[in-house]
Amino acid sequence: MRDMIIVVPIGEVPSDVLSFLSENIESFYMKFGIGVKIIGSLPISAFSHAYDFYRNQYLARHFLPALSIIRRDYKALAVMGVTEVDLYESGLNFIFGIAHPGFGVALISLHRLYPEFYGEPPDRKLLKERALKEAMHELGHVFGLEHCPNPKCVMHFSNSIIDTDIKSWMYCKNCLRKLEERLGRGYVRGRT
């Protein structure tokens, strides 16, 4: 399953969001011969060591080794974890997601992507669009892309949900060219 992106729910994650992510990520990456597969969920209790009681958040980097083991076991190109818990990293109040290109893994949180988090009415379509943008962003990092200055590019850094809402779920022309060069040259495929 080398040319496969594995999607792993961590804790309870809505199945419609997972399906939306899987279908749209695959529709884009299929041109590189990369498919997407959703596997069974990991219990959030497996990451109790990442929980900060005072912040009521999970330290994102502690999820990555488990995702890396899944990548190895499935011989996958990449693994994308999806969770509903709130994530943070040292020096940051929160993060929407994290990626580790060396491990070939990424993680996104839906927690702050729900419109309800901001006091807005529920909007499933908006939630799914935001989740797709964050997933494509983190996968871009997995495949070697850096942040992009173009605010419409999915690789633009999201400092707030406003930034996420402004950008597209697609890579800009420059980032797409870099991605095509990397995936076309076996940038990721040659890794173990």
Swiss-Prot record:
InterPro entries given in the database record: MetalloPept_cat_dom_sf (IPR024079), Pept_M54_archaemetzincn (IPR012962), Pept_M54_archaemetzncn_arc/bac (IPR012091)
Membrane-spanning parts: none
Keywords: Hydrolase, Metal-binding, Metalloprotease, Protease, Zinc
Gene Ontology biological process: proteolysis
Active-site residues, Swiss-Prot/TrEMBL: 138
Residue stretches in coiled coil: none
Cofactor note: Binds 2 Zn(2+) ions per subunit. One is catalytic, whereas the other seems to have a structural role.
A Pfam cross-reference name: Peptidase_M54
MF terms in GO: metallopeptidase activity; zinc ion binding
Statement: the UniProt record of this protein carries the keyword Membrane: no
Cofactor(s) this protein requires: Zn(2+)
Binding-site residues, Zn(2+) 1: 137, 141, 147
Residues noted as binding Zn(2+) 2 in the record, renumbered to the chain: 148, 153, 172, 175
EC number(s) recorded for this UniProt protein: 3.4.-.-
Entry's family note: Belongs to the peptidase M54 family.
Subunit and interaction comment: Monomer.
Its biological purpose: Probable zinc metalloprotease whose natural substrate is unknown.
NCBIfam families linked to this entry: archmetzin
Identification of the protein by name: Archaemetzincin
Native source organism of the sequence: Pyrococcus furiosus (strain ATCC 43587 / DSM 3638 / JCM 8422 / Vc1)
Gene: amzA
